UniProtKB/Swiss-Prot annotation:
Any one GO CC term of the record: plasma membrane
Pfam families: MurJ
Keywords of this entry: Cell inner membrane, Cell membrane, Cell shape, Cell wall biogenesis/degradation, Membrane, Peptidoglycan synthesis, Transmembrane, Transmembrane helix, Transport
Subcellular location per the Swiss-Prot or TrEMBL entry: Cell inner membrane
Species in which this protein is naturally found: Burkholderia cenocepacia (strain ATCC BAA-245 / DSM 16553 / LMG 16656 / NCTC 13227 / J2315 / CF5610) (Burkholderia cepacia (strain J2315))
Topology in the lipid bilayer: Multi-pass membrane protein
Major subcellular site: membrane
Regions crossing the membrane: 93-113, 133-153, 159-179, 188-208, 233-253, 275-295, 317-337, 358-378, 390-409, 448-468, 483-503
Protein name: Lipid II flippase MurJ
Family statement: Belongs to the MurJ/MviN family.
This protein's pathway: Cell wall biogenesis; peptidoglycan biosynthesis
Consequence of gene loss (knockout): Essential for growth, it cannot be deleted. Under non-permissive conditions, conditional mutant shows growth arrest, dramatic morphological changes and cell lysis. Depletion causes accumulation of peptidoglycan precursors in the cytoplasm.
Function recorded in the entry: Involved in peptidoglycan biosynthesis. Transports lipid-linked peptidoglycan precursors from the inner to the outer leaflet of the cytoplasmic membrane.
Amino acid sequence: MNLFRALLTVSGFTLLSRVTGLARETLIARAFGASQYTDAFYVAFRIPNLLRRLSAEGAFSQAFVPILAEFKNQQGHDATKALVDAMSTVLAWALAVLSVVGIAGASWVVFAVASGLHSDGQAFPLAVTMTRIMFPYIVFISLTTLASGVLNTYKSFSLPAFAPVLLNVAFIAAAVFVAPHLKVPVYALAWAVIVGGVLQFLVQLPGLKKVDMVPLIGLNPLRALRHPGVKRVLAKMVPATFAVSVAQLSLIINTNIASRLGQGAVSWINYADRLMEFPTALLGVALGTILLPSLSKAHVDADSHEYSALLDWGLRVTFLLAAPSALALFFFATPLTATLFNYGKFDAHTVTMVARALATYGIGLVGIILIKILAPGFYAKQDIKTPVKIAIGVLIVTQLSNYVFVPLIGHAGLTLSIGVGACLNSLLLFLGLRKRGIYQPSPGWLRFFVQLVGAALVLAGLMHWCAINFDWTGMRAQPLDRIALMAACLVLFAALYFGMLWVMGFKYAYFRRRAK
């Protein structure tokens, strides 16, 4: 498998997902701005998203994919299919029960996540109602995650990468065609989540059928629980869930703090999140997606050299592409925010608030993306306890940082704390891989960094000049001109960065690597 071609495939569909995601956020921003309605929706949407990351997308993927790869490479098709059927049965039934409990206790859940909304007589009940509507989303997205894990293990990356686009399409359709006809327009967004969750699973069925891995959900989850592969996955999910829950606990605490910083703070951070997740998904998630199955196979084959080489390739690609992305978030935060969101009720003040959060995200972006590359180095070896221990320490540091940064820079202090924590997390993961002899750096890193820093310094200067010499919020009345200027700047940035690297003798051929 050509790793770079696989990366381009996943990144291409992820780019489509993020573009449609930005379109959805732009429509929501234009319709609702940063108001009690958006605060209520984003708090409500964060709840099933947190549970999704805990039970499905995060802990489940980390535990399931390495074991699935082991079954595929060592036990054959029939045993692998039996594992998929049993796992889908357990997952569907467990999360269906959790959904019922969540719907019944929605008011308590919202209070726990964003107690600051409780004093708002309108936002709190809105958040509770939308939480009840969206809770079943975790059932559909868990099946989607299982399907994605299966397809990725079979080196089929296109459909899993495309699936999130359908959630954004559902949002856009709801905002444009449904919301204007509802008494409470924001409820349309909640129903879009459910529709999008169903579509994300259905679109992957053709790919599953092609490899004869369509999951069959049984009526007896207790019998499925006795499958030895399921037992192993669940045993790995315990520390994996704890690892992911530590990160999500940090998000919950930050949401709670943001809800106490005044109206709009939750939304400011959410809009910054959308922009920060753009490079994170295009690079970090895409690389993690293609590396985990290949790392798992190298582990099963006991090929330590290939294992280390895969990590080395992933780290170099990360630094190559994450560095300019981080500079863009830091130096170009206001232009990016204004171009994408400065329409309708999204005024200049909101642009400033979002840009502050986005710029501080830029400080920690490389660390955030590196985690997506380094953590699979442990997961593929079915070692989840080490990332757990690191995550606990990082949670403490992150929250202590909030006490320092939030009083100084308000809501931007929350995003800065996340970045600081991510950098510490990635450093400790790297040291752990080196200490265990899992990763041995290939020759040429010093030259690579010298070239990278040289190109980055020149790029930073150009970005800063473009940011301060154009009135990005003042171009609100000429949106097409502003979009054209943004496109021209981004093309210029890319040409300068990669051109400078080429002038300094950078070897791009290294990145055309094949996995065994």
